């Protein structure tokens, strides 16, 4: 993978994770983060430039979907789950 495409992929990966962390709903947030990490790990050994470009284009579309869903989730927020309200144990 060329240096520029590697940097582009890393920027896209970080942007997707950053945007996913903005989900208000715990289940959506954890699912999106897990799915992004799994997808990038699964495709990390792809060498074909055409396939890499197709995956980058798909990731860009997915980033747009994540942004839209985060925005919709913020408009129609719900109460936090019990798991989100737990305090972290003190050391």
Swiss-Prot record:
Modified positions (N6-succinyllysine) in chain numbering: 47
Main location: mitochondrion
Binding positions (pantetheine 4'-phosphate): 6, 44
Subcellular location: Mitochondrion; Nucleus
CDD domains documented for this protein: Complex1_LYR_LYRM4
Pathway of action: Cofactor biosynthesis; iron-sulfur cluster biosynthesis
Keyword field contains Nucleus: yes
Record has tRNA-binding as a keyword: no
One example GO MF annotation: structural molecule activity
GO biological process, one term: [4Fe-4S] cluster assembly
InterPro entries found in the cross-reference section: Complex1_LYR_dom, Complex1_LYR_LYRM4, ISC_assembly_LYR
Keywords for the protein's UniProt record, in alphabetical order: Mitochondrion, Nucleus, Transit peptide
Any Gene Ontology CC annotation: L-cysteine desulfurase complex
Summary of subunit composition and partner proteins: Homodimer. Component of the mitochondrial core iron-sulfur cluster (ISC) complex composed of NFS1, LYRM4, NDUFAB1, ISCU, FXN, and FDX2; this complex is a heterohexamer containing two copies of each monomer. Component of the cyteine desulfurase complex composed of NFS1, LYRM4 and NDUFAB1; this complex contributes to the stability and cysteine desulfurase activity of NFS1. Interacts with FXN; this interaction is nickel-dependent. Interacts with the cytoplasmic form of NFS1; the complex increases the stability of NFS1.
Function as written in the Swiss-Prot or TrEMBL entry: Stabilizing factor, of the core iron-sulfur cluster (ISC) assembly complex, that regulates, in association with NDUFAB1, the stability and the cysteine desulfurase activity of NFS1 and participates in the [2Fe-2S] clusters assembly on the scaffolding protein ISCU. The core iron-sulfur cluster (ISC) assembly complex is involved in the de novo synthesis of a [2Fe-2S] cluster, the first step of the mitochondrial iron-sulfur protein biogenesis.
Name listed for the protein in its UniProt record: LYR motif-containing protein 4
Organism in which the protein naturally occurs: Bos taurus
Gene it is expressed from: LYRM4
């Amino acid at each position: 993978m060329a240096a520029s495409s590697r940097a582009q992929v890393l920027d896209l990966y970080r942007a997707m994770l950053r945007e996913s962390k903005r989900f208000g709903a715990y289940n959506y947030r954890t699912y999106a983060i897990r799915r992004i990490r799994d997808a990038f790990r699964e495709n990390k050994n792809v060498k074909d430039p055409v396939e890499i470009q197709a995956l980058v284009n798909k990731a860009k579309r997915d980033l747009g979907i994540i942004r839209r869903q985060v925005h919709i989730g913020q408009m129609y927020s719900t109460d936090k789950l019990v798991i989100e309200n737990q305090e972290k144990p003190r050391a």
